[in-house]
Amino acid sequence: MSYIVELLTAALCLVLLIASLSLQRYKEKLSLFTGICLFIILIVSLFSEALLNGSQSQSLFGGAYINDSFSTFFKQLFLIAAVLTVLISRDHLVSKQGEFYALIVSALLGMMIMVSSGELIAIYIGLELMTISFCVLIAYKGDDKSKEASLKYLILSAMSSAIFLYGLSLIYGITQTTAIKEIAEALVTGQIAPLEILGMIFLIAGFAFKIAIVPFHMWAPDIYEGAPTSITVFLAVASKTAGLAVLLRLFMTGMSSASSYWIDLIIVLSVITLVLGNLVAIPQTNIKRLLAYSSISQAGYFLLGIIANSSLGIASILLYSLFYLFANMGAFGVVIAVSKATGNDQIKDYAYLAKRSPFLAAVMLISLLSLAGIPPLAGFIGKFYLFLSIIEKGQIWLAFLSIGMSVISVYYYLKVVKVMYFGESPTKLESIPVSISTKLALTISMTVLVILGIYPSQVVNVVLSVSKAFLS
């Protein structure tokens, strides 16, 4: 029963769809039901055979679907993100509809399929399931902004899927297979043709959209601003890490022997993503757009682990993914609470937040400083291992550039902190109410960022063992 996590997730999706149609009176209870079910699935995943047995992996359909410690780690990451998303969504008007939660679980299932796929067609199926679910979720508010954001996401997603499929067809045309393991064998034994290199470039471009890597980032600011904020954070965290997981499996195992052909492209993408993401974030006055460009710059840091092309590089991506999840959940959770109270997402609306809600201000402070990589918070540990991995690779200049961009990011993060603690006091100081479910999600996020920043050794050991098992 090593695939029980996926089966339970699919069953939950069906139950939610049926319940939303037949149990109209209990629609508002579905958020609690969904949260509890997702938490139970997370507990089941924590005790799953693949993670407990370290390097042991199992496969279905001739290796098309793989369950190993690598995929299990990311599934747990997605489940945590889904649980926290449900918690912070409970007070939203859009969350009163049962299908809202069915779509979240549907997107979650698509991500699980993506990270466990050992075959390009299976990856595409998971990718489309996730994308279609997000297209509907982004438009869920029903206003003009969310509809526009959904349409943009739909059109650009279709383009990225077409690019991915074209790359897939080129790889298949040369290697006569879509199985990642067989592609790896074909690349090792044969001479790499120009069309294969072109296919690799198209595959990278297809997933660069999902991760919001420059120049495939154009959708992120508008969609982050227009979508319901709880969906924005789920998209920013889970969708990004799902794309990263696929890139890792595809290029670190399937195409590692051809790394000399694609690694320079990844370096270029990382540099322009780091520079543009951080510089364009500086003048932003809308908090969601600022966090969108912050998310774009974070994608550049993630690419450092792929550039390292080593066990430490993979481990650093796993580690940073975990910390990135909680930092974004904390920041966007505060955005939801403040936006609900003020009706705006402007940074100026956070004036004197420390007086209006000390709890929200503290969560935002810790989340932003963690994203900036300030010790002793968890984000510092994640960035430390990312920088260490590329230094071991000999890319000293890239490490210094990344550190410099981190210093720049401190400026625009502290701009928000300054407004919260020292901004011009509004004429009327009104306290901002925070629901129990939102407070629980924010407390979990803040606690994890602090504790794992001070005591990271246990988590570091886990990701190192997962990365070694993945490469073996």
Curated annotation (Swiss-Prot):
One MF annotation (Gene Ontology) recorded for this entry: quinone binding
Keyword Protein biosynthesis: no
Topology in membrane: Multi-pass membrane protein
Principal location class: membrane
GO biological process terms held by the UniProt record: ATP synthesis coupled electron transport
TM region positions: 3-23, 32-52, 69-89, 98-118, 120-140, 154-174, 197-217, 228-248, 262-282, 295-315, 317-337, 361-381, 394-414, 440-460
Reaction(s) this enzyme catalyzes, per UniProt: a quinone + NADH + 5 H(+)(in) = a quinol + NAD(+) + 4 H(+)(out)
Leading EC class: translocase
Coiled coil: none
Source organism superkingdom: Bacteria
UniProt KW Phosphoprotein keyword: no
Keywords for this protein: Cell membrane, Membrane, NAD, Quinone, Translocase, Transmembrane, Transmembrane helix, Transport
Pfam families: Proton_antipo_M (PF00361)
Annotated Gene Ontology cellular component terms: plasma membrane
EC number: 7.1.1.-
Location(s) in or outside the cell: Cell membrane
Purpose: NDH-1 shuttles electrons from NADH, via FMN and iron-sulfur (Fe-S) centers, to quinones in the respiratory chain. The immediate electron acceptor for the enzyme in this species is believed to be a menaquinone. Couples the redox reaction to proton translocation (for every two electrons transferred, four hydrogen ions are translocated across the cytoplasmic membrane), and thus conserves the redox energy in a proton gradient.
Record family assignment: Belongs to the complex I subunit 2 family.
Assembly: NDH-1 is composed of 14 different subunits. Subunits NuoA, H, J, K, L, M, N constitute the membrane sector of the complex.
Protein name: NADH-quinone oxidoreductase subunit N
